[in-house]
Regions:
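Short, surface-exposed binding/anchoring microloops in extracellular/periplasmic proteins
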Residues: 21-53, 60
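Tryptophan-paired
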Residues: 47-103
Length: 232
């Protein structure tokens, strides 16, 4: 009888180990989207884990506009806002986000596989000037020409530099049924954007597509390195 109990206990422990190995790792995290010199709208966000949808939101916010001074001075940096709460949502391994670029007058789709160790990266804490911070803000940036970067940023923006997780050229969406009925420009009032910024962009041309890669790399290289004291 005792031998049977030991065998049963060992079998249960094995099942628990297997279950733990496959379980989703949970961490406090959030997401956001933005641009480095453009007006944009985020229109859909979906996160996946092991092939299943864990978060989906058909809609989102738009930013106010691109700063005149930054366009003239060629000052490029990622900015934007946060998304909806992700409380209780496991850390995803894949993301799909749809954004409208006012400069390009296009709707783009970004599809990206996220690092396998993303939960661990998000959980790592750092001492920064006597305070604790961690990189658990997943940020999606879209630049003119469809260039995108996926970054891992500090929760309170204290820990730097931002970590580049992925980059590439987003795919222009041509399969949206409503876009075929009403143009993207009409849906989002892009004509007003053109009136306000059209001449400015002609006078001060900006990079396009992968031309952004070295520019944004240089921006990150200038960020202070405040991740020197990880919390063990």
């Amino acid at each position: 009888m005792l031998k049977y109990l030991f065998l049963l206990f060992g079998f249960c422990m094995s099942l628990m180990a297997c279950s733990t190995g496959n379980a989703a790792i949970r961490a406090n995290w959030s997401y956001g989207s933005g641009s480095n010199i453009d007006s944009f709208c985020t229109t859909k966000v979906t996160f996946y884990l092991h092939g299943k949808t864990v978060f989906s939101y058909p809609g989102g916010g738009c930013n106010a506009g691109a700063p005149y001074k930054d366009i003239i001075e060629k000052k490029y940096y990622w900015s934007g806002g946060g998304g909806l709460p992700t409380d209780g949502v496991p850390v995803p391994d894949k993301a799909e986000i749809e954004m409208v670029s006012f400069h390009d007058r296009k709707r783009y789709r970004i599809k990206v596989d996220l690092p396998a160790d993303l939960p661990q990266q998000m959980q790592q804490q750092y001492q920064v000037r006597g305070k604790i911070d961690q990189r658990n803000w997943l940020y999606f940036g879209l630049a003119p020409g469809g260039y995108y970067e996926v970054l891992l940023k500090g929760d309170k923006l204290r820990v730097k530099p931002d970590l580049l997780l992925a980059r590439g050229i987003a795919k222009e969406m041509t399969d949206d049924w409503y876009d075929k009925k009403v143009s993207v420009a009409e849906q989002y009032g892009i004509e007003d954007f053109d009136k306000e910024y059209g001449e400015l962009f002609k006078q001060h041309p900006i990079p396009r597509g992968m031309e952004w890669a070295p520019i944004m790399d240089a921006y990150r290289a200038r960020q202070p390195k405040t991740d020197q004291y990880p919390v063990q």
